[in-house]
Amino acid sequence: LADMGATIIKEERLTPYSLRYEIKYDKDLMAFSKKIESVPMVEILSIGKSLELIKDIGDAKQVCDRYGLSKIKGTHAIGHARMATESGVDIKSAHPFWGYPFSDVAVVHNGQLTNYWNNRRALENKGMRFMSECDSELIAVYLAEKMRNGATLAEGMKDSLKGLDGVFTYFVATKDSLGMAKDTMAAKPLVLYESDNLIAM
C-alpha cells in the first residue's frame, strides 16, 4: 500500500483471511483498488471514506464477534442474515453489497430481480464491476452508477423502481442517509421498530 502512495494509519488482522486497513490516500480510488486486486488471491471487500462493509459467512453473533463489531462507533448500520436461494454461499455473495467503484453506498436486499442479467450487462458496458452473481449486488451497483452521474440517493432509488423488475425490498445506507424501497407489489416484508434510543428496520 505504501508503495502505491498510501499512508498506513492502522492495520489489523481480523481473521486468518481478512485484514482491515485505515489509510490516507488522496488520489484515484479506482486505480488504487485495481492495483491492489492485481495481486494474486487479494480482493477488496470494501473501500471508502465513510462506510466499512463487513462480509462473512456465519450467524450474526459469529460475525459480530469475529470482526469486533461491538467496538465500532458510528451513527447507523445495516446487516442481513441471508438464506441463499439463487447464488452461492460465500463471502462474495454475502450482504451488504457496495457499488464498485462508488464506494460509500451499501445495500441489503430480500427478493428476486428478474431483469438482473440485462441490467448487469448494461452497467458493465458503462464500466461498473460486479464481484458476485447475486442479484442483490445489482441494486448497489445500479444506485452507485446513478449517484456517480449526479443523482441524489432519493433520485436513484426512485429510478430503481422503474429500472429493476421483480419482487423485492431493499435497504440502503450512505454516510449520512438511510433509505428503503419496495417493488410495486410490496410482497417482501420490512418491519420498523422505534423506541426512545433505537430505530430498527
Short names for language-model regions:
Residues 1-201:
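Conserved short alpha-helical segments that host acidic/polar catalytic motifs at enzyme active sites
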